[in-house]
């Protein structure tokens, strides 16, 4: 009788693993140190968001979007606001568009800073997260000064934004950009040439362009494989078509390329922010920040103190809400994690009939098995980090 030394393991990665980015549970089948199969178990953070939205008015649905990708909340609201605006035919004034773009780019930097620095932490570098969180703290303060909340803003409303930015805040955001670019250079210097960081990321989790399209990837995941696909450029929304920025693309499609793209995107976001700040202090210094269509946007508070009609109007908008013409629309934005889309079906009432949320992280997570096969166990956390997954949007 011959004896065989079998080294097949089934292990659980998560749900409380420090590298699992939330409540992810992966069931791994290993042959020694080599991963043979990865089975993601999702649903641990499922809150029934899409069903809850069907019972709320269009205005009451906005806070649900903050809680999807809670790392960059305003980018999610943006997609929903665009969908409602397309159904109602609402135009957003230029100052409102610039504020939206400014805060969308702040969200992109928030997300990329968290991802790049925690990616470094997953492979064992402790300094970058400390630097990254210092910058994220300043950005959270900008969120707070715009709308009063650090995380769940409910600031992008259909028709524009909730309130105008103070002049001083716009100036402070402008002053923040240069020191931030210095921090990005510091993180760059620490990681990009670092031998250990390279060994942990180069040629790990390689995706060819055909595979990226086939798996339904978007955002950094397809750009890392060599496609210059960015919704801000290919299907421009708001005022992105008037702004100058470059789209970085990779050629190897591995974790390291995706890291490099996120680093460049932070610099490009800062460049977009500078253009927005210049215009908000220049030609768009004064002006409305939300649509003047009184059927969607509530009257100003001062007006309500003077006019009975405004008070009635405000009461109607916040109790019954506005009725959206029947129809369906798909609105997508280039969120930090990829293409975040909202498919909104209206039946002509004050509540959505159906609101399907297309989360980029969901499509990326399903490819975990394909990406990790044949890699070492330690590479699973590197691949997971480069996918940039947040569980709020995967489980919704």
Curated annotation (Swiss-Prot):
Q: Provide the species name.
A: Sinorhizobium medicae (strain WSM419)
**Which compartments does it reside in?**
Cell inner membrane
| GO MF terms, alphabetically ordered | NAD binding; NADH:ubiquinone reductase (non-electrogenic) activity; quinone binding
Is Cell membrane among the key words of this record? yes
User: What name is this protein filed under?
Assistant: NADH-quinone oxidoreductase subunit D 1
Q: Which PANTHER family match?
A: NADH DEHYDROGENASE [UBIQUINONE] IRON-SULFUR PROTEIN 2, MITOCHONDRIAL, NADH-UBIQUINONE OXIDOREDUCTASE 49 KDA SUBUNIT
List the EC numbers from the record: 7.1.1.-
The enzyme's first-digit EC class, named in words, is translocase
**Gene Ontology CC:** plasma membrane
Its encoding gene is what?
A: nuoD1
Q: Which reaction does it catalyse?
A: a quinone + NADH + 5 H(+)(in) = a quinol + NAD(+) + 4 H(+)(out)
What this chain does, per the entry, is described as: NDH-1 shuttles electrons from NADH, via FMN and iron-sulfur (Fe-S) centers, to quinones in the respiratory chain. The immediate electron acceptor for the enzyme in this species is believed to be ubiquinone. Couples the redox reaction to proton translocation (for every two electrons transferred, four hydrogen ions are translocated across the cytoplasmic membrane), and thus conserves the redox energy in a proton gradient.
* Assembly: NDH-1 is composed of 14 different subunits. Subunits NuoB, C, D, E, F, and G constitute the peripheral sector of the complex.
Tell me what topology the record assigns in the membrane.
Peripheral membrane protein
